Every structure is written in structure tokens, then in C-alpha cells.
Amino acid sequence: MKDEHNQEHDHLSQKEPEFCEKACACKEQQNEEMQEASEKECEIKEDFELKYKEMHEKYLRVHADFENVKKRLERDKSMALEYAYEKIALDLLPVIDALLGAYKSAAEVDKESALTKGLELTMEKLHEVLARHGIEGIECLEEFDPNFHNAIMQVKSEEKENGKIVQVLQQGYKYKGRVLRPAMVSIAKND
């Protein structure tokens, strides 16, 4: 029995180096496979990060484009409203002129009549509404300003110096600071 045991032990001892070689080869193969898997994982990770970065940059560009379009639409909408208000204001100017003419005619006949008072009140209310919407009359003080006044004629005037406004022939209006219609005036010429 001892002999059998020794033979078996010798047989195992002979197989041990062979087993070690196989185990080492297997371990090396596992290490190589692990290294390949790790390299593949790194490549996948790098590829994912690159695609993520590209997608993020595309998102930022699309978002910026969207914001620019949104701003442009808001600006266009605002400009369209401004244009509409300006157009309405221009269309109202002849009505205002007619109302002012009626008031002046009525005031010449009877300044205290109900008609004159009604026209005056209507003019005041109309100017209040127009002012609320940025439409206001151009002031025609002493100085002539070609940006706001249009000189229709020159008249001799002993009371005014050359180039000063003598009379307003037609009221001018501006919308939010921009001239809708210049005031038509006569200016003094004393040569």
C-alpha cells in the first residue's frame, strides 16, 4: 500500500509542473483577455465621451439658434405692432385736423356755446388717449427746428426775429419721439 501511495505521489509530482504550466498559461490568457476587455472598455468609454461631447455641442448650438429665433420673432412682433400703431396714428391725423378745424370755427362764432365746449372736451380726451399710446403734438415754440417743423411760408413780423415761428398752420405729431408729420409753420423774415 505504501508503494501504491508512493507511486501515486510520484505520478502527481510529475503532473504538478505540467499543471502549473497549464495554470500559468490559463492565467496569462485570462490576463490578456482582461487587458483586451479593459482596452475595449476604454475605447467604448472614449467613444461615448466623444459622442456625448459632440451631442452636447450640437444641443448648445441648437439651443442658441432657438434663442436667437425667439428674440428675432419678439423683435419682429414688436416692430409690427409699432408699425400698426404708427399707421393708425397717421390715419387719425386728418380726423384730428378736421376736429380742430371745427373747434376753431365754432369758437370764432361763439366761444361759450355747447358745441364749442363739446368740441374742446372731445379734443382734450382725444389728445389724452393719443398721449397714452405715445402720440403727441409737436411743440411749436419760438425756435424753428427743421427736424420737427416745415416752413411753408415766410412773413414779415415786427414782433418776431428772423427765423422764428410766427404761426402754426397745421399741427405736427410724433409717435414715441419719431416724427409722424412735421408741424407746418410760417416763419418771420424781416429783411
UniProtKB/Swiss-Prot annotation:
Assigned GO CC terms: cytosol
GO BP term (any one): protein folding
Subcellular location as annotated: Cytoplasm
One Pfam short name: GrpE
Keywords: Chaperone, Cytoplasm, Stress response
GO MF annotation list: adenyl-nucleotide exchange factor activity; protein homodimerization activity; protein-folding chaperone binding; unfolded protein binding
Cited InterPro entries: GrpE (IPR000740), GrpE_coiled_coil (IPR013805), GrpE_head (IPR009012)
Domain of life of the native organism: Bacteria
Cystines in this chain: none
Similarity annotation: Belongs to the GrpE family.
Subunit structure as annotated in this protein's UniProt entry: Homodimer.
Primary role: Participates actively in the response to hyperosmotic and heat shock by preventing the aggregation of stress-denatured proteins, in association with DnaK and GrpE. It is the nucleotide exchange factor for DnaK and may function as a thermosensor. Unfolded proteins bind initially to DnaJ; upon interaction with the DnaJ-bound protein, DnaK hydrolyzes its bound ATP, resulting in the formation of a stable complex. GrpE releases ADP from DnaK; ATP binding to DnaK triggers the release of the substrate protein, thus completing the reaction cycle.
Protein name (Swiss-Prot/TrEMBL): Protein GrpE
Biological source species: Helicobacter pylori (strain P12)
Gene assigned in the entry: grpE
